[in-house]
């Protein structure tokens, strides 16, 4: 069994911590790994329908969804993604964070919510996970953007089939978005 022998916080910023972890392998070998400790995030795949019943037996080309564009500094480009955000409010339940992010980024509130699952973002460099929710029964509200990336965010409505095709063509490369759309497709 692998064991952590000692951890040291190298740097802290916002809600993240860069951690240096001194480990021991099952054979007693000692080694060091550095990773980003994160509170995690949420993602919301929008279903443009009154209820989840509309998904059953339906064609993915007839089911609408919503994506938002956001500039991502590590890639130096704008990416299309599902509405999402950090779990940056201490002790806030994941679904409440998802509801808040949906309103802030897409200007939507939803009546019905379903938890789809959790994914590890990049397990070699961070312990961050993304909890994915689906929602439907939509109502528009005023968008509450925070920060320069969100100030320049665009909202795009398209069918789930179109979004999945954008993933296959490499136009959507964000992992949480690809996984969320695949999980949503499994509900049909």
List each model region and its residues.
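Nudix hydrolase/Nudix homology domain
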Residues: 2, 7, 78, 115, ...
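Active-site segment of metal-dependent pyrophosphate-handling enzymes
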Residues: 40, 62, 71-73, 81, ...
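Acidic, metal-coordinating catalytic segment for phosphate/diphosphate chemistry
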Residues: 7-53
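Short loop segments at secondary-structure junctions
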Residues: 26-27, 48-52, 71, 136-140, ...
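Conserved Nudix-box catalytic region and its N-terminal flanking loop in Nudix hydrolases
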Residues: 36, 43, 54-100, 149
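Hydrophobic residues on conserved beta-strands that form the core of alpha/beta folds
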Residues: 4, 18-20, 32, 68, ...
């Amino acid at each position: 069994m692998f064991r952590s022998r000692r951890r040291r916080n190298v740097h802290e910023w916002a809600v993240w911590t860069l951690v240096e972890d001194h480990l021991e392998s099952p054979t007693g070998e000692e080694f060091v790994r550095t990773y980003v400790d994160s509170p995690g995030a949420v993602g919301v795949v929008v279903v443009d329908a009154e209820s989840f019943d509309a998904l059953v037996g339906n064609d993915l080309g007839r089911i609408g969804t919503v994506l938002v564009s956001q500039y991502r500094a590590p890639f130096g480009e704008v990416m299309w993604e599902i509405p999402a955000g950090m779990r940056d409010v201490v002790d806030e339940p994941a679904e409440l964070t998802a509801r808040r992010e949906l309103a802030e980024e897409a200007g939507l509130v939803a009546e019905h919510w379903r938890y789809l699952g959790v994914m590890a973002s990049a397990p070699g460099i961070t312990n961050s996970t993304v909890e994915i929710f689906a929602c439907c029964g939509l109502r528009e509200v005023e968008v509450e953007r925070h920060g320069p990336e969100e100030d320049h965010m665009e909202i795009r409505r398209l069918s789930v089939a179109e979004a999945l095709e954008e993933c296959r063509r490499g136009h959507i490369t964000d992992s949480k978005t690809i996984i969320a759309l695949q999980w949503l497709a499994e509900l049909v």
